[in-house]
From Swiss-Prot:
Record protein name field: Insulin
Role summary: Insulin decreases blood glucose concentration. It increases cell permeability to monosaccharides, amino acids and fatty acids. It accelerates glycolysis, the pentose phosphate cycle, and glycogen synthesis in liver.
Any one GO molecular function term: hormone activity
Disulfide bonds: 31-94, 43-107, 93-98
Gene that this polypeptide is encoded by: INS
GO (cellular component) term, any one: extracellular space
Location relative to the cell: Secreted
GO BP, sorted A to Z: cellular response to oxygen-containing compound; glucose homeostasis; glucose metabolic process; positive regulation of protein secretion
Matches recorded under InterPro entries: Insulin, Insulin-like, Insulin-like_sf, Insulin_CS, Insulin_family
Keywords: Carbohydrate metabolism, Cleavage on pair of basic residues, Disulfide bond, Glucose metabolism, Hormone, Secreted, Signal
Amino acid sequence: MALWMHLLPLLALLALWGPEPAPAFVNQHLCGPHLVEALYLVCGERGFFYAPKTRREAEDLQVGQVELGGGSITGSLPPLEGPMQKRGVVDQCCTSICSLYQLQNYCN
């Protein structure tokens, strides 16, 4: 019993000197399979909304933006007029840094 009394302060010191716990979720760039895995973890059984654009839809969107701006793809930037584009999960979490709260917005 006396041995436990001597070890207790040592165990308390070791517990205090231990590494700090890492935050559960750090805002970060999430792309490809990492983004999908994070959405599965955040949304769980609810699932998440994901409707990728086909290559044709993406090309049509670029052509429409060029026609609005009157320039070429490699030329000047198109004007800010026109319909606003809704940002998707890839724009929000892969191109920019994404938070846990932002990921939850894509859950069903």
